[in-house]
Regions:
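PLP-dependent class I/II
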Residues: 1-19, 27-61, 74, 78, ...
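Pre-Walker A segment
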Residues: 66-67
Length: 399
């Protein structure tokens, strides 16, 4: 007998991946340079030279038995210490290596965080629009995902919609700032209000409600925006991070979980992660890559192209009359479609070789996502196709 649950999931293939596959197939027909693929959030800039140099140096000058050997169950101590020191310096925290667990990307960090603070049957509350993979992450841990409807005017938290979803069975609240797909970063005021609410709700329900903060886009911030660090606002915070975007190394699958030193049972979180790894098979990430990122915590890829692309695309969308919130960061923008059915809108866009992702799977019907992590020249060239699309299908012309 096979696991029917996973077989059933075969019919729920990622919409993002489906549209990306359409782009690839269409590109084989007409040349990929003629397909304006805004589907997939894959970094489009190279990793920093320091990362390449670190890998080369480690491969050439480190004892291969050590370099390619197993790391400790709780991951590489020197990498954990370096991450803790970096976070302390940047955000005024007091982490030690004992509060850091290296993971296979932010997905691995989230898998561990959910199992650290919740037991099957409890619920996790998040906010639309949200990354669609949160649903299998949460349900795979035996939990229920509750989704707060979006506040579309600015994509900050609608507390009147959020509060009724939190009850005695809520284990954690899951946030993503800057957000995929909206690009919005939660303000300090929003985070303080969220922290105050969670303190009160924890007291009311008689147990700590954790905040799980998913932060893979932290370094991609625009216009000098300071992205507030959620763990500064709420003690019971587990931070989940990936280097995929900041270092442009998504295929290396490297990130970490950071447990706020003041959270409940802080000293137990990282050892618990070691035990969770045993149960899930989500064992330590590559020893080589742990050592490499340890040397690169103060650098990023050249992320400026994303802000350039965002400004170009935002101005074009506004000129075409789209309703759109200007992103604070990430490499996504999330406009309102020109009809209520965003799926139909995105299907029509494909006739003009535009690959756009409907917002339904992000918990926000009627909107669509554009991942502008592509060449700036291609962003500019896509405008002619976008203008033809909205003129032919909706009678909209550039203002």
């Amino acid at each position: 007998m096979i696991a029917q649950h996973y077989k059933d999931m075969l019919g729920a293939k990622s919409v993002i991946r489906q549209i990306s596959e359409w782009s690839t197939a269409r590109g084989a027909e007409i040349g990929y340079e003629n397909v304006f693929d805004y589907s997939l959030g894959n970094p489009s800039v190279p990793c920093p030279p320091q990362f390449t140099a670190a890998c080369e140096d480690l491969l050439q000058n480190t004892d291969p038995v050590t370099l390619h050997g197993y790391t400790p169950t709780l991951t590489l101590p020197s990498a954990r210490k370096a991450v803790a020191e970096s976070l302390n310096q940047r955000f005024g925290m007091d982490y030690t290596a004992d509060h850091i667990f290296m993971t296979s990307g932010a997905a691995g960090a989230l898998a561990h965080a959910l199992r650290c603070v919740a037991v099957p049957g409890q619920n996790i509350v998040t906010f639309a629009p949200f990354f669609p993979e949160y649903k299998p992450y949460v349900e795979g841990a035996g939990l229920t995902l509750r989704v707060t409807p979006p506040r579309c005017a600015d994509f900050q938290i609608d507390f009147s919609a959020f509060a009724p979803l939190v009850d005695e069975n809520t284990a954690a609240v899951l946030i993503n700032s800057p957000n995929n797909p909206s690009g919005t970063a939660y303000s300090a005021e929003t985070l303080q209000q969220l922290a105050d609410f969670l303190v009160e709700a924890s007291a009311r329900f008689g147990h700590h409600i954790f905040l799980i903060s998913d932060e893979p886009y932290r370094e991609i911030a625009f216009g000098g925006t300071a992205i507030p660090y959620p763990a500064k606002f709420y003690d019971d915070t587990l931070t989940c991070y990936s280097f995929s975007k900041s270092l442009s190394v998504p295929g290396e699958r490297i990130g970490y979980l950071a447990a706020n030193p003041r959270c409940e049972d802080a000293a137990a979180i990282v050892p618990m992660c070691g035990q969770i790894s045993r149960g899930t098979g989500h064992n330590c990430p590559s020893s080589l890559i742990q050592m490499a990122v340890e040397r690169c915590l103060a650098v990023t890829s050249d992320l400026s192209v994303y802000e350039t692309n965002m400004n170009l695309l935002y101005d074009e969308l506004c000129a075409l009359g789209f309703t759109v919130v200007k992103p604070d960061g990430t490499f996504y923008i999330f406009p309102k479609a020109l009809e209520e059915d965003a799926k139909a809108f995105c299907r029509k866009a494909q006739k003009y070789d535009l690959a756009l992702v409907p917002g339904d799977s992000f918990g926000c019907p009627g909107y669509f996502r554009m991942a502008y992590c592509i060449e700036t020249e291609k962003v500019r060239r896509s405008f002619a196709a976008l203008e033809r699309f909205v003129a032919a299908e909706y009678g909209v012309t550039k203002q």
